[in-house]
Amino acid sequence: MSVKLDEKDLAILTLIQENSKLTANQIAKKINIPITTVFAKIKRMEEMGIIKQYRAILSPEKLNLSTAAFILAAVSYRAKNEDETPISQRQVAEEIARFPEVQEVHIITGDWDLLVKLRAENVDAVGKFVVDKLRLIKGLDKTLTCMVFETVKESTSLPQTFRKNLLKP
């Protein structure tokens, strides 16, 4: 469901994505509107679910979690014997999502069913996660682990292309 926003809404969203610690007063000054308008627009966008959360972005390297990996996983949809109930992609994805090491789980198309992103202390910790936790999940057929050498871009901000799609006519 798409919503229509005005230029001020989009300016507020852009500023909040860049720095969620900005006060309403700082936002009002930057985009030259009354502070009451900023409060009202933010409240409306929160109620509409456009603004879901405010959070800090932590440095994995400073917290000894500098190793990132992406794991492709295939789900076995058929029960191994007649007594078992088949398991769904979603069930396996939800089980994987419970692990604290896991940052993201996506149900995808193609030869693989799931894409998992995780952070760990080192390559050994990634290996232990895959062998001792991930591969024990019922319904998981096989995995392919891709270690990250270097991250060129990592962002939680939505691209600015949303601007043209959401502007009120």
Placement of each model-derived feature along the sequence:
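A compositional/biophysical signature of low hydrophobicity enriched in polar/charged and small residues
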Residues: M1-P169
